[in-house]
């Protein structure tokens, strides 16, 4: 099993914990730290949609809360026919906390695609803009 396969599997597993009673759109993410640790996250919806948190952000926040600061890949899995890339807010956080890492997109049908973060987020707002 490759590192990317392991991340996809971890994202698939954590996706099962998603709380999506309104959209039924369950997403899992798995973030790989350079230490070798994998941090999973699933989306958590709220009746006030603005309080909903995406799987990618939860994975990042979980890793950060446990002291990790260096990451080299993230996988995002959803049960869709097409692949589901991170939303704009997640792209901003991935860029700021992870940099130009590979983003592995996968669905439950076995389709995958790996993109570099700079392809998903070509003109980021970051500390150089401040």
Task: Describe the residue ranges of each PLM region.
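Short Gly/Pro-enriched turn/cap motifs at secondary-structure boundaries
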Residues: 19-22
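Short beta-strand scaffold segments in enzyme catalytic cores
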Residues: 24-33
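Hydrophobic "anchor" residues
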Residues: 37-38, 112
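Feature captures the catalytic cores and cofactor-binding loops of soluble hydro-lyases/lyases
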Residues: 58, 62-66
């Amino acid at each position: 099993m490759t590192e990317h396969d392991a991340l996809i599997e971890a994202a698939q597993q954590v996706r099962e914990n998603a709380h999506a009673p309104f959209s039924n759109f369950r997403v899992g993410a798995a973030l790989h730290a350079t230490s070798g640790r994998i941090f999973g996250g699933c989306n958590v919806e709220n009746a006030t949609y603005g309080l909903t948190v995406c799987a990618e952000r939860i994975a990042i926040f979980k890793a950060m809360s446990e002291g990790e600061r260096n990451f080299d890949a993230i996988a995002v899995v959803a049960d869709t026919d097409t692949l589901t890339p991170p939303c704009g807010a997640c792209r901003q956080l991935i860029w700021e906390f992870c940099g130009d890492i590979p983003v592995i997109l996968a669905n439950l049908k076995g389709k995958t695609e790996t993109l570099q973060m700079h392809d998903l987020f070509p003109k980021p707002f970051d500390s150089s803009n401040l």
